[in-house]
Each structure stands twice: as structure tokens, then as C-alpha cells.
Amino acid sequence: MTIQQFYRKPAISEYEIKLLKNNLKKQHNIDIESIETEYCFNVQYPDNHKLNESEQSTLVWLLSETFEPKNFSIDKSFLKTTTTTTENEIIIEVGPRMNFTTTYSSNATSICKSCNLSIIDRIERSRRYLVKSVSKLSEKQIDQFLELIHDRMTECLYPTPIKSFDTGIIPKAVVYIPVVEEGRAALERVNKEMGLAFDEQDLALYTDLFQNQLKRNPSDVECFDIGQSNSEHSRHWFFNGKLIVDGNMSDKTLFQIVKNTLKANPQNSLIAFSDNSSSIKGFKTKVLIPKSQIEASEYLEGEREQPIIFTAETHNFPTGIAPFEGAETGTGGRLRDTHATGRGSLVVAGTVGYCVGNLNIPGYELPWENKEYNYPDNMANPLKIEIEASNGASDYGNKFGEPVIIGFTRSYGNTLPNGERREWIKPIMFSGGIGFMDERHLKKEQPEIGMVVVKAGGPAYRIGMGGGSASSMVGGDNKHELDFSAVQRGDAEMGQKLNRIVRSCVESEIHGGCNPIVSVHDQGAGGAGNVLKEIVDPLGAKIYLDRIISGDPTLSAMEIWGAEYQENDALLIKAEHKDYLKKVSERERLPIAFVGDVTGDGIAQLITKDGETPVNLPLDKVLQKMPPKTFVLDHVEKQLKPFTLPKELLVGDHQTCFNECLNRVLRLLSVGSKRFLINKVDRAVTGLVARQQCVGPLHTPVSNVAVISSGYFGKSGAATSIGEQPIKGFISAKSMAYLTVGEALTNLMWASITDLGDVKCSGNWMWAAKLKGEGVELYDAAIEMHDVMVELGIAIDGGKDSLSMAAKAPKSDGSQELVKAPGALVVSTYVPCDDITLTVTPDLKLSSKDDSVILYLDLGCANNFIGGSALTQVFNQVGNDEPHHNTPLLKNTFMAIQKLVKQQLISAGHDRSDGGLITTLIEMSLSGNRGLEINLPDTHNSDQSPLSIIKLLFSEELGAVLEIKKSNQQIVLDILKQFNVPTQVIGNTSCNNNNNNNNNGSDEDLFIVKVGDKLIYNIKLSQLSKQWEETSYQLELLQANPTFVESEMKNLLKRATGKGKGPNYNMTYKISPISKELALLANKAPKVAVIREEGSNGDREMAAAFHFAGFQAFDVTMSDLLNGNIQLDERFKGVAFVGGFSYGDVMDSAKGWAGSIRFNQQVSKQFDHFYGRNDTFSLGLCNGCQLMALLGWVPYRGIEQTHQPRFIHNASGRFESRWVNVKIMPSPALLLKGMEGSVLGVWSQHGEGRFWSEDQSIVNDIKANNLSPIRYVDDDGEITESYPFNPSGTQEGFASLCSKDGRHLAIMPHPERSFLSWQWPFMPENIKQNVGGLDQPSPWIKIFQNAKSFCDSLN
């Protein structure tokens, strides 16, 4: 094989180079003068085939930047060392390891195949750095440089340009362990060598199995298999174990305690504790589904009973070792858990959580962080985990097409009064998912003899080796290399294709077909061995090793069988359905393999091509119900001290004391803004998100509850919320559990739900449970959670545990300390939502004292306990007082709020949690961009000591704050009194308090707090906003272009001045009503081809928008067009190019998609003909917009390639998820007719949305001919290049392009995710009144109605 090199510069941006140089200086004291970079594309093709001129031209177009041909070179590097100073210059090249094909190569070769370059079978991209240093770099310094620029698991140093991908590695032979001869000693040896995590009971059990029962030696493959399948991670020994608590045998296991909540409150439950997700009854739902799953076809309306599903899990150990990869595969694994429920289910949205140790942000002092703490070398530091784990999870969800709609994060590291250091060195990476399923597919069917075992998804790689057993160990107990080997690597685009075939099978039944899936399980811990045994249990199967698709020819049998390579499911189907599944998979371009058959002999047998059987295990022996293990749990007396304020704060005035406390608390990660997390993750894809993290005119990240819709046609849906209060556990595990459940419910209660009894929960436990004093705390928490839930009438129906939450860290004296993470319980609720438009959000909405009242619901009954609060944490304390427990009051409050929500008597509402009452009020004020005047009663004679005021304002007892209209005050108070909810009137929204004497002449709203008429706090909103945003801002500086981060902060502070100020939306037209007979009219309706490519994810919402406007939408893949299964012929009046990440954005956004059209003559002719017809239109959104530019459809034909406008990487250097303001300009665009002059909000999500043209004359032409009809504008409706109003940094505010005849329109933002009013995160009253309410289509439906009007005009 021949490898040819192609070069493109630069590989990384200027700001990334600056960041790299800064990190080298800060972390290793290495001074670098300059760094130049380039990519090297290593392209492999057969020796006997030299690329001809046409093939090379195609490849160059794909690999190069179209407008920068000078920055691309064939065979010749751009990087040269000088002849005079080579001592201080070095070229460093890093790239993928040769032994496996990367995700990049898989996508790149798929693109090549679509572009008639199937001769190319591999393309690997390396990065080359020309480093000029102040002095010659030592070997150690080069290693330190390498640490910062590559992933040592998947990449390596290239000392010279590579000549071959062949490594010469031969797969390791199967080894047999001499258990028959040596007994237990042989197993002990392999246990240590392979990191299998066998304990004493395991060793005895498996020695007996092989020595006495099977009477043979196990292979290393079998040992590895058993080690993964029977680890704590997989078997949950602790939750299933016998517990001796303080010397007394508990009559229930932890699982029995947890499951008893469901036994007591089974209402609405369909699947619980028995599948990959849990499920509850949902609603009968109208859906829009393609008629066929194996060929292009029209979308048709259908109905199904649609239960709601939820799953939640953690990926803590892998995230601690490799944060980005651990979090992305945690997300991917949870996604597969979601769709592998029953006989296949439907993914909708995700939830996330991150808990890390002290951040230690360079240059940003947080006074409670201990700078003397040391961290282990084999794990990432907390700051890196916080940033990179969230990057990994976000990136995977963005590419997959799953929105993240709610979450949490916290940082903790402290020394307790007993001298023990507690910190999340081993982090929490939490991932939850909510979705739906077809009720007909609730139960997996049992295997039958002759059924076919299928592996669907990505090929086998040497990644994720031993993740199950490694996750079951304390961090530091395993060899570092084994730790790193246990981390997986994700491929979101492959995961999305896998999800599509599961969805295709699920949806095949809607229009009269048959779901071929008998059973489905996702591949996770234990790899193929675990999932294949699981799916054929108890009948057994013969599995053929050589049928399992491998991406690495050097893999051994053990690695193919045991590695957790991602994006893989095991399916069980009947033999007669093989052809159907194959057709579905070919259409979606997903690899599948029919790897074996169910036998009925009860044995899982793995057979090599040579006839060897490295696995030959009787399932009843290895998957049997094992004898429970026994755990001894004893309470350890807590050493607690009451919370005290520093003396210097006690002697000053109350305001000084309060200001210092608040300044600290607002900078705590769990309390302050989470903007650094939410702006980089998609929160609207699918078009089914009714409520996500951001609210109010400034799109502020303050949420109670997340809500999704059942579909596009009605108002039913599902709500989910999260509760977690781990720091309270240092005082009392029971209090922690009570507050966790309470927080989950006081977050949930703002959505309109069917019934409290319908609420079901996932319980996730992250604890160092097997260490002294910890298991009993978990036990106490479980008992309290049980009691509270039973009394409330809710229940747990699923969850996961991670019980090795500790890590070894070095001490200054050279010894090690074992650092336990705080014990954590995360409760995720989910419940049917009867009206998604009624959800109450925290942002204040009323205008003045005259029309507003603020109510305070204190479920702590004025006790104001502060133990384990944010306040105690920021003074390096814990406290000793427990919160007030009152479950009946919690239940009554929930019921009262539900009644008020359904009667629409609350304008804004928010729970009390981290940071206390003052934080609740601040978040309501900032999110509404409105002032507040609060006057709390002084019930504790606060003149004597500021501590009582501090406790009043910072206590984290359960509670809530409501904003209501003054005209509704009496009816609201009556309802609250009816439910015996203690309520106080504490103030008013105050948008006109700028006349207050204390404002120093400012025109800003003020946030004012008094206690007993005594002024405690008086601050301008912009100053308050700066404090609340500060830590998020510091984190943002480390993950995006600092210039743009600073711009956002500057603009935010300009905007956060009160009076409800925000975008000035203006709608200049009325929209036509939606027909009630869309389904009946479909056959006569104009036809639009909704075209998607591999990796697209915006097709369903696009089809729905066109359907609502009266079109018959067709589901058309590029595979359909390339295979000639459908023509873009006269029947189609429109084409819609959808959003997403075609080919995972490999070779630049939409480049591969454009190439598959451009370089296929037959398809290219069809598109040219369609474009040339005068009776057609096209609409490209996001990825589709990028495609239309690359095809030259906009702004007009005939532009030279190097001058053709493009949409390139955002100037901020990252994916941007924003709710932006746009103005619709006068233009030829037919689809925007009548909308001119309107200023509207719209979802915008992209990583490459910056308009770019090298030719200023073309830019001038676009402006002169009004060919950019949608432009980014600021709050005043003025065209802007200012970030984040303009999220991509695009010149002239260009957010769109259209053709000169107006028939072809390309838009970067997402009107198809904004065409229904409930999809808008913020809709001001003037727009709401214009469209007729949140249950109506939004102003953006006009685009699609205009397309229909154009088609109608042709007749």
C-alpha cells in the first residue's frame, strides 16, 4: 500500500497557540518564542494505483480550505527549521496510533466513497508543530510538551513521516491459566496481573468452578470475561448484599429498601429495575413518521401510546482518568441505555452533572480552596475535569443530536473537623436521559433456538479494556496503564447511526410494519462478552469471533471479546428478519454483523476461525444468582463544630458582614452562573424541548425543571428535575437524603404534571461505601429516602451505584492519603406533563410595586439551619445543625403550587437551595432583569448579632419564592392557607426603583434587601450580575477565545440594568391559521424532499415545520439518491437540507456532503436540474446552509471557487448554542415575503457559522442586492458583529444568504426548532399576543407557509 502526504496549515488557531504557550510556562516553566502548526493527511491507497488528475483534484478539494489554496500542499510540508538556529527549533508530529482506524478516518473514507474515491481505504490526520524555544528543549521538556498536545491512549509521536500503517504486531494467542494444577494461586496471580478486582469470595467461587465443576483450565479470555461481568460495577454486590449494621443483621438489602418505595407507590409504573431504562405511562400521541424505513418515503401522521422512559448513570472513573473521553463515552453509553429499553426506544433529551474537587483556577483566588493539597499523577486535576468533561459530554450530544436540558455542578475540597480531607478527586460525571417508547415494545422477548445474534455499530478497537473492574476499585489501587486502558473513546456520529436503526425498527410498526427486534442490549462494561451472554441467557449461543467486525487487525481474542469499544448494540432477531435489518443498516450506513445463533444448550461459546473455543462457559454458572456477600457497617461518631463567622466580620456593621458572605457564596461553583456550561451544548435539537436551562430576556441559566413535548401536535409531554445535596451528608446522611428528595420536588413543582403519585425517580448513589463509616451512611440515607418517598407517594424505579468513590493522593511528606469523595445521592424525577405551556420559570416578569407581590414559602419553619450549606463551605466549615424535616408540609406545598400553576396564578417561581433565600431572590431578579425590594421580618432580634440575619438569608432549608400579580394576592394566599403552607409577603418586583435616593443618580434597577426595615443590601443589577457571573467567566476564559469571553461579559453587564430590558422583538405580520386537516390534504399537497446525510440530526423538526404549513414532506437520505432509489424529479417542488453534523464535520462542515453531490455525475445533474427549474425552492438550515454555500447555490452561481462565500469556524473557537436576535431585511427571498422589518428570537447552534468571503466585492454585492435577508442584531434591532449577539463573529451580521431570484434560501440559525411558540425559551407579551398564545405556531411558521404559497402560485 502507498501512503501519500498532504499538508494544510494551520492546525490550531492563534488563540489556541497562545493558550498552549501560557500552559507550558505556567505548568512547566518552558519559554516558547513561537509555534507554527500544520495538518498532515496520510492517505493510503494500493501500490498499483496512482491517483489520476481527477481523483487528486477531488481529494484536494475535500482536504483543503476552498478559499485558501495557498495553505495546502501536496507532498511538501510548510514547516521548515532554519539553518542557523536549529538548536532551539524542533518539529514535533503527533498522530493516531497505527494499530486502529480512527473515527476521523472512518468518516473521511466514507466521504471518499461517496465521492467516487473508494480506492482510498484510510486517511489519518496528524498534527505537526514547529516549536521555537528560548533555549534548547530537553527530553523531559519535550515530553511535557507532548503531554499537552496529544492523547497518549490513542495517539503517539511520529519521529519521522509515516510510510505505512502496518505495525507488524501479531495478535496475542489465547493463554490458559493452570487452575486445575495450581488451584487458587493461579487465579490470584492473573487477578493481580489483569486488574480483575476479584475479592476473597470470587477467588474461592471461580477456583471451585474450574477445578471441581468444569474440571478444566480457564482461558485468559474467560478470566477477563468473568472479571468484568461479575464486578461490583456490573453485579452491584453491595446493594444486593447482607448488611450487618452496628452488630445487627438488617432484614432488608439496600435494593429491597429502595425497591420498597415502588411497592408502596406503584402508580403509573411500567418498567422498573428490570431493563436499561425505567418507564411510566405517558399519553396517546400523534406522531409524524416516514412511511418506510428502508427507502425514501413520505412522512405520515400516526398515533401510538407513548410511555415515558428515563435512565441515569455515571461514568466517574473514566472521566477522572481522561475527562473528555470519559464524559463523551459516558454520554454515549447512557444514550444506548436509553434506546435499548424494551424492544427499542426513542431518545429525546439528556441531563448532566459534574462534581469535582477544588478548582484552583490560575490567577483567580477562591479563599476557601486549600493550596497545600496535592493531586495524583494518574488522574486529571479538578479544573481540567470540570472543563474537559463538560466539553466531552457536550460535544457528543451536539454531534449525536441530543439536547442537554438540565444539570448540576459543584466543587468541594475541605478538611473536616476530624482532620479528614474530603474531596472529589475521583469525580462524578452524571448523565441522565429522558425519552419515549411505543407501548407495544415495553417487554423484551425471550430468546428462542435458531434466533440470530447481531452486533450493530462500530468496529472493535483496543479501548475500554477492563472498565467494569477498574471502576470497582479505589483510584490508585490499579496500575496506571490498566487505568488508562479502561477508558473508552467515543464516536458520536456512529452512535447516531446506531440510534437511527433502532428508531427505524421501533417506528416500522406505526404504518403497518413489524419491529424485527426481539431484544436489544447496549455494549458497555465487559464488552461483547458481557452483552452477548446477557442477550442469549439462558439458552446460550455459538458466537463466531471472525464475524465480529474489527477496526484493528492486531486485536487478540480477549480484546475483541472484552473491550468496551463504543457505539455498539447486541440485537436478537428472527432469521426471517435478517434482510430487513440489513436494508435498514445499509440505508443508514451502519456496520452490522450476524455473529452467531441461539443454540439452546445453555453455553456461551466463542469459536475462532481455527475452531478453537477461548470461551465455553455455562451461563447458569457465570450468570447465575450468586451467593450474596456480607458487609459489616458500623456508625462512626461524627466530630462537628457549630458554624462561626470570622471575628472581624462580627465586629463590623451588618452590611459589611453580609457583603463578604455573599461575595464568597456567589463565587462558589454550585451557586453562581453556569453560563460556561450551557453555551457550548445544544438545548433545542429535535424541536421537542419546551423548557431548558435558560430563561428570561437575557437567556440566563437559571432553571427549576426541564420539559419535553410528546410530539409536535399537542401540549402533552414529560417533566424532569434533579435533586442533590451531598455536603449536608457530613452532618447527617438522613438530612442529605431528605433535602435531596425535597430539592427534586421543589424543582419539579413548577411544571403542570398529571399527579404527584405519577412521579417516579432514578436514584444514583456515588459513595466510598466499602470504607470505614461510609457504607452505614449510605444505608441511613437509603432508609430516610425510602421513608420520605413512601410518605410523599412517589417512588424510585431505577438508578445506578458507583461505590468506589475514593482516590489516593500524595502528601507533602511523600506518603499517600486516601481521599474519600463526599457521599452523594442524586434523585432525578420524571413524570407526565399534561400541559407543557404552563411551566412557571424563575424570571421576574411584572413591572412595578403596584402590580407585583413577592411571597416567601419557608418549609424550614423559621429554623434557618445552615449546616452543610454553601456559606459554611466558603468559610472552610461544615457546621453542626440539621435542617428541619417536615414531609407532610413538603407534600402540601407541592400540591398547592400545582394548583396555582394550573390556574396560572404565578408569574415567576423558584426553589430555595444552594446559596439560600438570598440566592433565590438574586437569580429571579437577574433572570428577569428586574429590580427587587425585599423586606423580611426580623424574627430573631438581629440587632444583637449579624449571624441571625446571615442564617435567615443563607439557610438552605427547603422553600420557595413566588412572584404574583397584586390583583391575585388574596386568592393565592387563600390557596396556600388551604394547604397549610407558611407564607410571608416579603416585597415587590421594582422596575422603577431608580428613583430611590440610594441609587446615586443611576438609571439602573436596584436589588434591595431589608430585614425588619433595616437596610442590609443595596446594589445595582449590573454589579450583582458581575459577582454572580465571575467564576463562570473565569472558567469560560480557559475554554474559549478570551477576546470573545470578555466581549460577552462586557455586553452582559451593559444589558443587566433592569426594567425587564432585553431584545426588542417586533413582528410586522400575521400568520395564517394551521389547517386541522393536514393529514387529509397531504396527498394533494406540494412535495418537499427533506434531505439528510450521514450525521444529520435536524430532519424530524424540519419535516414537522413543512407538514404544519401544508406540505407532504419526504424522508430522503443521500444513500437513496446515490443508489438511484429516488430521483429529485418533477414531483418535488422543494428541497430542504437539514441541520446537524454531516460526517461528524470531518473535512469541514458540510464538505463531505457537498462532495457527495458535486463528484457524482448523476446526482449532480439532478441537483443542477432542480436548481435551474423556475418552479422550485430550496431551504438549507445550519449544516444545510453550509452545504448550499459550498454548492454555490447562494448567493449566486458562477463565483470562482476561491471566492465563493463560506461558513467557517466560529471566531470564538467553539460550538455556540444561543437564543439570538435576528432582523429580517428587505430581500428577494420568497420564503421571507411579508416578514421584512421583523426582529425575532431564534435558536442558533453551530460550530462553523461564520460567514467568510475573501472577495470584498462579493460582500458588497450581497449587501447591494439584499442577498443576506436575515442578519444578527442587538437588543435595539441594530445589525451587529458584537459577541454574543452575533455568536459566530460573522461580518456584517450575515446569518443567511439567498439567491438573486429569491427561490433559494440558506440560514445558519434554526427556525425549524423555533416554529412552535412553546419552543421559544423567551417570548415577550407582544409576540405572544400576536400569535395567540404558547400553544400556537410561532412567527417562524411564516417561512414554511410562504413556501406553500409559492407552490400554490404555480398552479
From Swiss-Prot:
Cellular component terms (Gene Ontology): cytoplasm
UniProt entry keywords in alphabetical sequence: ATP-binding, Cytoplasm, Glutamine amidotransferase, Ligase, Magnesium, Metal-binding, Nucleotide-binding, Purine biosynthesis
Protein's pathway: Purine metabolism; IMP biosynthesis via de novo pathway; 5-amino-1-(5-phospho-D-ribosyl)imidazole from N(2)-formyl-N(1)-(5-phospho-D-ribosyl)glycinamide: step 1/2
Residue ranges annotated for the Glutamine amidotransferase type-1 domain, each copy included: 1087-1325
The reaction(s) this protein catalyses: N(2)-formyl-N(1)-(5-phospho-beta-D-ribosyl)glycinamide + L-glutamine + ATP + H2O = 2-formamido-N(1)-(5-O-phospho-beta-D-ribosyl)acetamidine + L-glutamate + ADP + phosphate + H(+)
Residues at the active site: C1182 (nucleophile), H1310, E1312
Residues holding ATP: 326-337, 406-408, 913
SMART domains associated with the record: GATase_5
Acyltransferase keyword on record: no
Domain of life: Eukaryota
Gene3D superfamilies reported in the protein's UniProt record: 3.40.50.880, Phosphoribosylformylglycinamidine synthase, linker domain, PurM-like C-terminal domain, PurM-like, N-terminal domain
Pfam families: AIRS_C (PF02769), FGAR-AT_linker (PF18072), FGAR-AT_N (PF18076), FGAR-AT_PurM_N-like (PF22689), GATase_5 (PF13507)
EC number: 6.3.5.3
A Gene Ontology BP annotation from the UniProt entry: 'de novo' IMP biosynthetic process
UniProt xrefs under CDD domains: GATase1_FGAR_AT, PurL_repeat1, PurL_repeat2
Sample GO molecular function, one term: ATP binding
Location relative to the cell: Cytoplasm
Amino acids binding Mg(2+): E743, N747, D911
Family: In the N-terminal section; belongs to the FGAMS family.
Chain's role: Phosphoribosylformylglycinamidine synthase involved in the purines biosynthetic pathway. Catalyzes the ATP-dependent conversion of formylglycinamide ribonucleotide (FGAR) and glutamine to yield formylglycinamidine ribonucleotide (FGAM) and glutamate.
NCBIfam families for the chain: FGAM_synt (TIGR01735), PRK05297.1 (NF003672)
Protein name: Phosphoribosylformylglycinamidine synthase
